[in-house]
Amino acid sequence: VDPGESTFIDEGATGR
């Protein structure tokens, strides 16, 4: 899982 994916899982798209 790359940083964008973990933020996506965690915050619902903020890291995408």
From Swiss-Prot:
It comes from the Eukaryota. This is Fibrinogen alpha chain. It is found in: Secreted. Keywords: Adaptive immunity, Blood coagulation, Coiled coil, Disulfide bond, Hemostasis, Immunity, Innate immunity, Secreted. A long coiled coil structure formed by 3 polypeptide chains connects the central nodule to the C-terminal domains (distal nodules). The long C-terminal ends of the alpha chains fold back, contributing a fourth strand to the coiled coil structure. The keyword Secreted applies. The gene is FGA. GO terms for biological process: adaptive immune response; blood coagulation; innate immune response. GO terms for cellular component: extracellular region. Heterohexamer; disulfide linked. Contains 2 sets of 3 non-identical chains (alpha, beta and gamma). The 2 heterotrimers are in head to head conformation with the N-termini in a small central domain. Its main location: secreted. The keyword 4Fe-4S does not apply. Cleaved by the protease thrombin to yield monomers which, together with fibrinogen beta (FGB) and fibrinogen gamma (FGG), polymerize to form an insoluble fibrin matrix. Fibrin has a major function in hemostasis as one of the primary components of blood clots. In addition, functions during the early stages of wound repair to stabilize the lesion and guide cell migration during re-epithelialization. Was originally thought to be essential for platelet aggregation, based on in vitro studies using anticoagulated blood. Conversion of fibrinogen to fibrin is triggered by thrombin, which cleaves fibrinopeptides A and B from alpha and beta chains, and thus exposes the N-terminal polymerization sites responsible for the formation of the soft clot. The soft clot is converted into the hard clot by factor XIIIA which catalyzes the epsilon-(gamma-glutamyl)lysine cross-linking between gamma chains (stronger) and between alpha chains (weaker) of different monomers. Forms F13A-mediated cross-links between a glutamine and the epsilon-amino group of a lysine residue, forming fibronectin-fibrinogen heteropolymers.
